[in-house]
Amino acid sequence: ADDLTTLRNGTLDRGITPDCTFNEKDIELHVYSRDKRNGIILKKEILKNYDLFQKSQISHQIAILIHGFLSTGNNENFDAMAKALIEIDNFLVISVDWKKGACNAFASTNDVLGYSQAVGNTRHVGKYVADFTKLLVEQYKVPMSNIRLIGHSLGAHTSGFAGKEVQRLKLGKYKEIIGLDPAGPSFLTNKCPNRLCETDAEYVQAIHTSAILGVYYNVGSVDFYVNYGKSQPGCSEPSCSHTKAVKYLTECIKRECCLIGTPWKSYFSTPKPISQCKRDTCVCVGLNAQSYPAKGSFYVPVEKDAPYCHNEGIKL
């Protein structure tokens, strides 16, 4: 999983400066469907030259997953999410593997320079995702309303850059972007052009789980602050809380129960009790969040163990 905790020390274990430079040819696409549950690896160029997607696949909703710093496209948490998306909603899942640009080869170092390179690479990956989207729309006739992006950490901001680029290409907007604890370091003071922003898709959902490694301001149509968005139950390290955002969404996709967000005006205010929640005031985290009318900031209480719900018997 992603590990921004390496930034805390700011030193190198091996006394070297990592080279996290990469180009488009280094990016792989891990494609999952009910026919290929374990995934196959493709390159964008192959998709351009051959009709590899069947019409039956393309007609489904498509989720494009984008990992973050030090991670890979087939990390165990994304793999679990892909399987849930396939099993529950028959999605076509495409995980963008930009591990070289995310410094995955230097996972044992405590390096600020490597992270800075990875931050710079997010724009290039965002453009790649937008160009890939253009291919889906123009060659495979996929409507933009069928495509959502799900990005964790740096991948959340990468999703935002892709969202900006598809609009520049006049393709329209993605149906949704879900930002899973969008990365904080190097983004804390950034304005919309330089981070994930609510205008990057028709609907932007952000799930905040770590005040140390994630941003602590609103970036979406709805911003869920799980356990006040600071640290998560059962986690002693910031990286654990940072990764919990992925696990929470996966459980929400399974729909065993609903993580309920209750209106929360600011950090200094008291969240509205879940017992007072109604469908027009509160929101369930997950793929159906758009179906609820409320927008803004929401506090989400959780339990320590999966499926994490702490709903006091309330159903929306």
Curated annotation (Swiss-Prot):
<dbReference type="GO" id="GO:0005615">
    <property type="term" value="C:extracellular space"/>
</dbReference>
<dbReference type="GO" id="GO:0008970">
    <property type="term" value="F:phospholipase A1 activity"/>
</dbReference>
<keyword id="KW-0732">Signal</keyword>
<dbReference type="Pfam" id="PF00151">
    <property type="entry name" value="Lipase"/>
</dbReference>
<keyword id="KW-0442">Lipid degradation</keyword>
<keyword id="KW-0443">Lipid metabolism</keyword>
<dbReference type="GO" id="GO:0031640">
    <property type="term" value="P:killing of cells of another organism"/>
</dbReference>
<feature type="propeptide">
    <location>
        <begin position="5"/>
        <end position="14"/>
    </location>
</feature>
<keyword id="KW-0378">Hydrolase</keyword>
<keyword id="KW-0354">Hemolysis</keyword>
<dbReference type="GO" id="GO:0016042">
    <property type="term" value="P:lipid catabolic process"/>
</dbReference>
<feature type="disulfide bond">
    <location>
        <begin position="192"/>
        <end position="197"/>
    </location>
</feature>
<feature type="disulfide bond">
    <location>
        <begin position="20"/>
        <end position="103"/>
    </location>
</feature>
<dbReference type="InterPro" id="IPR033906">
    <property type="entry name" value="Lipase_N"/>
</dbReference>
<feature type="signal peptide">
    <location>
        <begin position="1"/>
        <end position="4"/>
    </location>
</feature>
<feature type="disulfide bond">
    <location>
        <begin position="277"/>
        <end position="282"/>
    </location>
</feature>
<feature type="disulfide bond">
    <location>
        <begin position="258"/>
        <end position="309"/>
    </location>
</feature>
<feature type="active site" description="Charge relay system">
    <location>
        <position position="181"/>
    </location>
</feature>
<feature type="disulfide bond">
    <location>
        <begin position="257"/>
        <end position="284"/>
    </location>
</feature>
<dbReference type="InterPro" id="IPR029058">
    <property type="entry name" value="AB_hydrolase_fold"/>
</dbReference>
<dbReference type="InterPro" id="IPR000734">
    <property type="entry name" value="TAG_lipase"/>
</dbReference>
<dbReference type="InterPro" id="IPR002334">
    <property type="entry name" value="Allerg_PlipaseA1"/>
</dbReference>
<keyword id="KW-0964">Secreted</keyword>
<comment type="function">
    <text>Catalyzes the hydrolysis of phosphatidylcholine with phospholipase A1 activity. May act as an allergen and induce hemolytic activity.</text>
</comment>
<keyword id="KW-1015">Disulfide bond</keyword>
<feature type="active site" description="Charge relay system">
    <location>
        <position position="242"/>
    </location>
</feature>
<protein>
    <recommendedName>
        <fullName>Phospholipase A1 2</fullName>
        <ecNumber>3.1.1.32</ecNumber>
    </recommendedName>
</protein>
<comment type="similarity">
    <text>Belongs to the AB hydrolase superfamily. Lipase family.</text>
</comment>
<keyword id="KW-0204">Cytolysis</keyword>
<feature type="disulfide bond">
    <location>
        <begin position="235"/>
        <end position="240"/>
    </location>
</feature>
<dbReference type="InterPro" id="IPR013818">
    <property type="entry name" value="Lipase"/>
</dbReference>
<feature type="active site" description="Nucleophile">
    <location>
        <position position="153"/>
    </location>
</feature>
<keyword id="KW-0020">Allergen</keyword>
